[in-house]
């Protein structure tokens, strides 16, 4: 079972710093390459590279609200879930049902280019998770026992990557990313739950509510973008492959993204991904 994504909110703040003096032509080129659309949509990481001596710091905020339970592609009501067997033993059937979940993520990032061909990128991820659940009696009428919430917050992960410029001419930019992420937050957080018997117990939260899995993940990506005046089109393929884990891990992932952006002014752009 999993939750369907219902609402997203993205905010980003970044500062670009050039460490080298520039003449007039360099300054014009610098301004052209640092319009708002040169930064991809907030959900993309490592979407651009920098010139030698440039650096950037950024703060990204993302909020996700999720509701509804699914088994595969089939939406389940609470009564459907109460009929499913309990994989942990007693009671015989599932009796605690998630209702909705909020996730708040803050990403603190930094980039620095020691050369025109390599950009260093670091990221610290902080997360806060909150889930509302409902407990039902374990037998007979399966009446509602009550509602409760569980929460977790703190450091999630730290990552370091290298971005390698492959192409940068006539509005076309192509680069590769290779990095390593350490899921260094806590993976055994506990909280109080309302049991089907009506008691309050402190238990280890399920993996979806944990902040980290104590694993190391190899990050790799290939990103291409093309700029036409005030328009920009881009695509990115990305993989996250676990290379070392503790007792469990979140699993590997593979992503493909396509986006289009348009400048509104020097500091603002809209995007569709």
What residues fall within each predicted segment?
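Sec-dependent signal peptide recognition
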Residues: 2-10
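N-terminal signal peptide c-region/cleavage motif recognized by signal peptidases
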Residues: 14-16
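Transmembrane beta-barrel domains of Gram-negative outer membranes and organellar outer membranes
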Residues: 20-173, 179-182, 202-212, 216-220, ...
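Outer-membrane beta-barrel translocator domains and adjoining extracellular loop/strand segments
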Residues: 69-76, 132-140, 187-195, 236-237, ...
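Aromatic-anchored, glycine/proline-accented short structural segments
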Residues: 213-272
